[in-house]
Regions:
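Active-site pocket-lining/capping segments in soluble small-molecule metabolic enzymes
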Residues: 1-150, 154, 160-303
Length: 303
């Protein structure tokens, strides 16, 4: 992977464990055929957590890939690996979990390039800062920071390298433009959220996942947003008022000094993740070539 330069958009991609097989096929192509891909962007990280991770949150990943396998892949291509440790309901007794601590030790030891962790719970933030200081920390979008003053306070915290605000602040351009460059460098925009722009249940949705990971009882969350029965649709995400596509990144965000962009997708199918890779990284004239390299051949039947 080329060294990112000033003004390069860095994409943070989903499914470190869940979509291992997709990335194992895509990354060699990404390295070998740079002419297929935009030269103004690069892969900043791949994020996720193993399926049995107590500290995980946001979404549930299902994968049988081991931490050593995923780290071998990311290190081969010089990509940062981020652990999604965004469970919002952690208590002090959870911090002693041996599997989660072993996971963090491994990611800290194999730290070239530097690996990180996406966090929500304050007690985990402080625990990681003390015990695994080589992991950089990202403030999770599961905090649902919809108030710009809250975002500014989070950006001012030195323990966070990046902060992912709620997607409904993506177009708060007047206030975003007024941030000092040191804070602009920390804002990581969630680009492709499909959630209803008027949703008031995001915290409840994320908390339900946190409870499941901890094995706690509690109410199941059923999304009541318009179109919820259809599940995630990229076409619907594209007309969301908070959507950030490649034109907006090139023409609006990069010129204003913003370079960090998160792509959601954990829990979706790998075919949809490939569509994200095509939209955000791949030049239109080479998208068919990428499909042919990865899966499309003369014998493929869809129906």
């Amino acid at each position: 992977m080329e060294t990112p330069h000033q003004g390069t958009a860095l994409f943070h991609l989903p499914g470190l464990f869940e979509f291992y097989d997709l990335y194992a096929a895509f990354l060699p192509l990404y390295r070998a055929h740079r002419e297929y891909f935009y030269d103004w962007c690069a892969i900043g990280s791949i994020y996720g957590a193993p399926s049995d991770c107590l500290w995980a949150g946001g979404r549930v990943e299902c994968s049988d890939r081991t931490p050593r396998e995923v780290l071998a892949l990311t290190r081969e291509y010089g990509i940062s690996a981020r652990l999604t440790l965004s469970n919002s309901l952690l208590r002090p007794e959870h911090l002693t979990d041996p599997d989660c601590n072993a996971l963090c030790r491994l990611f800290q030891e194999q730290n070239d390039p530097q690996n990180g962790a996406i966090v929500h719970a304050e007690l985990l933030t402080q625990y990681l800062k003390k015990n695994y200081p080589s992991l950089y920390l990202v403030s999770s979008t599961t905090k649902v920071l919809t108030d710009f003053n809250d975002l500014q306070r989070e950006l001012a915290r030195p323990e966070f390298r990046y902060v992912v605000p709620d997607f409904r602040l993506n177009r708060a351009f007047d206030r975003l433009a007024a941030l000092p460059q040191s804070q602009k460098d920390k804002v990581e925009f969630l680009c492709n959220e499909c959630c209803w722009f008027g949703c008031t249940e995001r915290r409840a949705c994320y908390e339900a996942v946190s409870r499941k990971n901890l094995g706690l009882s509690g109410p199941e969350h059923y999304c009541s947003a318009p179109g919820a029965a259809d599940g995630y649709r990229f076409s619907r995400a594209m007309v969301n008022p908070g959507f950030i596509g490649i034109k907006a990144i090139r023409d609006t965000y990069l010129p204003r000094g913003f370079t960090q962009f998160k792509i959601e997708g954990r829990g979706l199918g790998s075919a949809l993740i490939l569509e994200f890779l095509l939209h955000y990284l791949t030049k239109p004239e080479y998208q068919l070539a990428v499909r042919e390299e990865l899966y499309l051949d003369t014998m493929l039947d869809l129906f």
